[in-house]
Amino acid sequence: AYIRQVEELFSAARTAFKHLEYYYFHNCLYEGVWKNNHRRWTEQTPTTEVMNTYGKDYRCIFVGDASMSPYEIEYPGGANEHYNTESGRTWLERAITKWPNYLWINPTTKEHWEYTHSTHIIKEIFEDRMVPLTLNGLKEGMRHLS
């Protein structure tokens, strides 16, 4: 639902960053990501490959509504589209350890975050570095990334 909005965000962000790469994931980060959402099943990139390609000096920005079953974050086998051998939390923690300048941008309004348990879990993992997709939210997010 947010793909076009996020594509516009990253199109605008290209002018702010020297090097910008983006990958898609569904709900939570797991062992594979993809560059083209229409080819998500046929052209996945291993998450470990992405982590080995970009150094710790890169900024890592996740964009998503963080709304999913808590099982998708907390348990192996919790993903709703495939069997994940490691929890989403494990992958998210690896990512934020790899890239200490990280951020989660949430396109849903901040008022709705309190109604979704998974949003609270992601905010906790991200040490409250979750901002709304608003001008003020993006300004706050840039402070987290610097």
Predicted regions and their residues:
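Acidic, low-complexity intrinsically disordered regions
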Residues: 1-146
